[in-house]
Structure formats: structure tokens, C-alpha cells
């Protein structure tokens, strides 16, 4: 947990109120490594000018973005007040933004602007107050909503439209149309529902500075009501000391935080509130109940009455009681011994074999792979890809189980790797990997090693971000010419790690650091058993909708959040609430020791909250599931269900929008002035899915990520040349040409297609290295492209190799450590025959107790030799020796012999 997190309020309950001390200290960049912050990180990369970014968040003339504001008169749409009323529970955050604007234009106005909307968030309500009346937005099919908006404007009425950005970049589009001049102030209410941000074992409430309009002075106020199921250990505020806090109970599970400030043109810092909770190593639950009768449906201002059939269906459904359940879990694995970890996993390694990797880089990569393949164990599946202008792979059919046969194949494959595959096209091998169905028993982890840039970085990062629920990515950037933002962006898009390797001679050590993180304890193949809840339905058909349907493996220092909704007849609802005992839901998962674990979660249906926030969030997560299915299948069934859920829970989505129209008492006849905040040719930020909680080192939280931050600062220091122009399609450039990261997309956001990946010449000096600039545009899903050239495995006579050898065939190595590791079997042992020449004297001294198991003695000798001779290179051999120790202990246990005793004996003989 955050080391310097200090409790702001150890005293004070009930009406006692305190000003927050300004001395609380937090590592300033720590929260920026959280998965949820990746959205804002990309926002900052694409809009580094804070003034420009904040102008987008407010209403102003289009030229306001490009010229000095003093050159304009006051014909503007001005914000005069901005307040946020938020409610936070264990998993869910509900925010009501209230913004009051004054139209000082001399002509009717259509104002257009976009609000950044995190992938964790959606809009669930929208209303407008003007001329003494309040108009509520109604959810409609997006096409119908746009038509209704256009019709209202054409007839001289007022209209307001809220919708998700059509280009899928997670912006919220907001249009106010036909507002007459000198009108009284207009107040907009926008309700947003969001999954709470988390980092390590803390919950985060963040208001990013880009959300605050850049305008003349206006009042801002924040009220945050907190209701948690667990006691609050400490609260951290990153901001000025004008915050105040009031606890509402002695258990410190409820509190209210308030903040007021005058904002304007000055630089605005992020507002961050961090909650550290008491540790509970079991899943927590939060229950919400809704009981809606027919009269409620009839009077609901948000309900859409496009069709009688929809109304009747909604009425029928809402005669029942509806429950929403939120489950969250932050497991801890502090007591697990590393040698005992025996979890399943799929490991896929992608090696850049383009021309610029020739020489030391590819030699180091090959040596690193020789160590890596000995560090895996028999619980793994694995594969290796070499990519350049095309790609090839060790196993054409996909990842294979790790055993002596597959190890022999890969050993020969690795020995023939060379930098002979031309350019750098990474998208096609990534597509090949992600097109294969995930095996939930084997969490998929991808390791990418590259020294350059790709021609389609934006598509690549956007594509992999869609698979963050199934895949974790680790990236290695080699040398000074690497596209740093490619390295960082890929890893963060899928909640992994990255490292930047300036000197290829350090590659083996750096590669093993990330591989060690991939072997940290994990809960995988997670599922929930809701059968006890279903049993209480008295035989009536009952459906529980869980979202997300596919649960991401819970890697070390990550938090799981899962939601479920269930609708019951009122008699069944009463039966469950009066059951007398909590209902048990069982969470099942494959544990880090190789066993199947079960966690019992108690659902106390007597202790529920009467609100709709979890219902709405559960529906939003379900819509996200459906949108992902639709992306892959393009079937209309998902679209129809998305629209149905959007209407039922009043949610803006890809296919639904909120629209408000009003007939004007005096139809507007003047020409309407369009105030466009974001011009069509401006560059839109990429929004990368939930990169959510940043994994940390198993032994020392934050240590590794702090090293990464410092490493990137050192790596970037002093190098800031502008990116060179991206090359268009065509033949490879002449030798000596300089390549770099692609430039920002042209107007419209599209990149030109390139068949050759550009890369800097490896001969360039480090001063030519490009800084981490990210010029990306998130578009609709990638359409299937023509198959890439699938090159045959390098220098192999046939892709179908002989699997007859039960032990790896290794090529001689000048590195004595690698030479020893190359003789290791898949189970971690060394055979007597494989080390006879090197250990002939020591082998002859085999203890009598081990005479029947000669390979055990041989393995102990090699372990002892490695530990003694290569102690300074422990990071390279640690995983290999761990599986060797495990194998030896298993054999000695059968003989009722002591591991420590015979290890000491072996050490004395080497």
C-alpha cells in the first residue's frame, strides 16, 4: 500500500468537523500508475496544452481555441457555476454535474462540446432547466434521437442532445440547440455512473483538471457522500486545505467530504481523494433493491414511450422486486512461498527480428530466450513468435504444453533466430494470437521485445485494449531508437509492465524481472456459483445476469469487481429477505498453489440500500459485454439488447442517446450560430480500455513501478526532437534512412496504410531518440485484413520437427550459466548423463540413500554449482532453480529424506 499515506482523521465522529491538514504526503505520481488513470494519461499525451484541453470542456466560439480570448467580445456562452454531487460505495460512483451557463450571444446559438468520459463511466441522466421549467432527457435509439433533435431545431424549438461519440473514442457529445439570445440562464444536469477507480488496496476518487472549463471566474463546489461496507483506515486529499470531512458513524464507514473554490483561467490541479480500507482477505458484497410499480413507470420522466410493447414489457418486468449485487475482492498472497507457486499460465513471446536488431540486440534476445524457456514449468503452455515484415512461430497450431518434447522444438527454434525478417509489423502476429480462444485455466500473458516503431501504433494499442479482460502484456523497449509510447501504451492497455533497456548487454536481467512478475500469485478461471440464491426461488424460473461475464484473472495486487442483477416476484423477495440466514454465493478460482479454491460470500438481503446506482452500473457493464460481442460478431441481436438495456436503465451507449426537445413559445426565426468546441479536423485522444490497477512487485509494493518511473525519466531526459514524417506505402527505404514513431494522424484521424514498418537506423545516436509522444485515434473495430505473410521458421528445414528427443538439444554456448541451464529437463531436473563430463568427480560421491535416484543427486549438484558460482546472476536462474528444488523435494519426500541435508552435502562437493 502507499507508504506515505497518512490518516487525516483519526478522531472525530458525528457532528465533529475538521479542516484537512495540508501536511499529508503522497507519492505524487503514484496514482498515475493506476489502471484507471491510463485514460487520462492518454488524454494528457494527446492534449499536452492544458489551456486548450480545458477550453474543450467549456462552451466557447470555435476560434477561441486558436486566438487570444481578449480579441473577442462577450458574445459567448459563459459558465457561471459548476457543482458536483457525488455518492461513493464499495464499487460504484454516482456523480451529478450541474453547470449553469449564460448565453450572451446576439444570435440564436447551437453549442457543441465534448466531455471526456472514462471507459469506466457512462451517462445515465440528463436534464435542462430554463425559462422556469425542467426538461428531462429520454433515452431513444441514437438514430431516432438525432432525428428528433433535428426536427425540433428546424421547427424553431429548443433541443438538447447527449450521446456517445460516434468514433468510439469515449467522449460524451453534448449539444444545445436554438438557444435564443438574452435568454435567462440555462442549467444542465448530467448524471454519470462509474466503477470506482482503485489502486493496490485503496479506492480513488479523481476529478481530472481537464474536466474544469477554462473560462472567466466561476464558482465550483464538490460534495462527496461515502458509504462503504468496510471501515476507513485513512483518507488522503491531493489538493488545497479547504476540504472538510465529517464522519457519520463510529465505525467510520460513512462520511461526507466537501470542497469549494473559485475557478477560472488559472492552472487547476487534479482533485484526488484516496480511501485506504481495513484489510479483509475475502470478497465483500453490497446489495441494492428496487421495487417499482406500474405507477412509477408511468410517471418516470426518463421513460421512453416509442412503442406500447416496450411499455408493457417494462411494466410487467417492474412488477417484481429487483436486486443488484456488487462483489469486490482484493486478495493478498503474503504468506505464499515462491517455491510453492504452481499455477497454470500461457506465455507467448514476440521477438522483433527486423534488420535493426542485428548484432548485439538479437544475440542478447536469443540468450534471454534460452534462459526464459528454462524458467517455465510443466503447468505452462507457451509459444514464440518472430516478427518483422511478416512473422513465424515455433508452434503453428498454437501454444503447446511445456514438456521435454516441446522444449526440444523451441530450443532448436531459438538457436536459429536471427534479425532477417525486414521491417516491423507487430499488428498481424498480435491478431494471430488474440484470434485464438482463451483457455480460462491458462491466463494469457504476452511478452513483446522490440527496438523500434511500428506503422500502425494507434490501431495496435486500440486493438489490444479490447482484450484486457483476457490478456496481460509485458513490453521491453531496446535501445535509444525505440518508440517509447508503443512500449508503454501496449503494456498499460492490458494492465501489464514495461521496461526500457538502453544497453542490450543487460537484456537477460531485465527480461527476467518482468517474467518473475508474471509468475506472481494469481487467481484464475474465476466463476461464481449462484445456486443457493436460485434454490430460494421456489422452483420459479429465475435469471441472474452477471457482468462482466468473463472475469479477468486476479493478478497480484489487482482488484476484482463483479455485478449481478436478479428480478424476483414479491413473494419470493420476501422469502429471501426473511430467510433467517445470509444467502451464500461461492466464488471459485484456480489458486497459485495449483489447487481449486472456494470463497464463500455472504449476501445479507435484509441489509440493502434503496437506490439504483448498482443496478445502473451492472447494466452498463452488461452493455460493455454486449458491445464487445457485437464488435466480434456484428450481429443485430446484441444491438437490440443494448437498446433495451439502455432504455430500461436510461443509459447512453453506442446505440442509445438522451434527447430533450421543447416547443418554443416564440419560434426562433433568426439564423442560428453554431458554437463548435472541437473542430472536425482536430486530433482526438485515444481512449484505451481500463488499464486499469498496476501490478506491483510481489515482495515490495511500489518498488518496481518507482524504478520504472525513474527509468523512463532517465531514458527520456534531454531528447525532444519533433517526430519525422511517416513514410507512405512503398518499397523499403534506402540504407541509412532514419525512421521513428509515426506522426499524428491527418485530418479525420486516419493513418495512411503502410506495408513496411518504419524504424530508426540502429546507427543513430541516442540524441535522435523520440520522446514518448502518442498520436492515436480510436476508431471502430478493426476489420479483418488480408493474412500477413507467415514466414517459415528461421533456418528450419521443416515446420514439422521431430519430437523424438526427450531432452532438449542445445547448441554450445559461450555463457557457462546458459550452458548448464540448456541441459535442464522440463520438470527441472538434470540427468546424470547430461552433466557427467563436468561433474564426474562429484557424481561418483553419490550418497547411498540416492543410489537408486541418480538424477536427484545430479540435480542437487547443478543447483549447488549455480548458487555458488553464479550468485551475482540470481535473477537469471532463480525461476529455473525454483522448479529444480521443487522436483528434488518431491523425490526426496517419497524416500522420506531431508532436502536441506542433501543440498548441503552437494554444496560441499562442487
From Swiss-Prot:
<feature type="domain" description="VIT">
    <location>
        <begin position="63"/>
        <end position="194"/>
    </location>
</feature>
<feature type="region of interest" description="Disordered">
    <location>
        <begin position="297"/>
        <end position="318"/>
    </location>
</feature>
<dbReference type="InterPro" id="IPR036465">
    <property type="entry name" value="vWFA_dom_sf"/>
</dbReference>
<dbReference type="InterPro" id="IPR013694">
    <property type="entry name" value="VIT"/>
</dbReference>
<feature type="domain" description="VWFA">
    <location>
        <begin position="346"/>
        <end position="515"/>
    </location>
</feature>
<feature type="compositionally biased region" description="Pro residues">
    <location>
        <begin position="720"/>
        <end position="749"/>
    </location>
</feature>
<feature type="compositionally biased region" description="Low complexity">
    <location>
        <begin position="750"/>
        <end position="802"/>
    </location>
</feature>
<feature type="compositionally biased region" description="Polar residues">
    <location>
        <begin position="803"/>
        <end position="815"/>
    </location>
</feature>
<dbReference type="Pfam" id="PF13768">
    <property type="entry name" value="VWA_3"/>
</dbReference>
<protein>
    <recommendedName>
        <fullName>von Willebrand factor A domain-containing protein DDB_G0292740</fullName>
    </recommendedName>
</protein>
<feature type="region of interest" description="Disordered">
    <location>
        <begin position="703"/>
        <end position="815"/>
    </location>
</feature>
<dbReference type="InterPro" id="IPR002035">
    <property type="entry name" value="VWF_A"/>
</dbReference>
<feature type="compositionally biased region" description="Low complexity">
    <location>
        <begin position="703"/>
        <end position="719"/>
    </location>
</feature>
<dbReference type="Pfam" id="PF08487">
    <property type="entry name" value="VIT"/>
</dbReference>
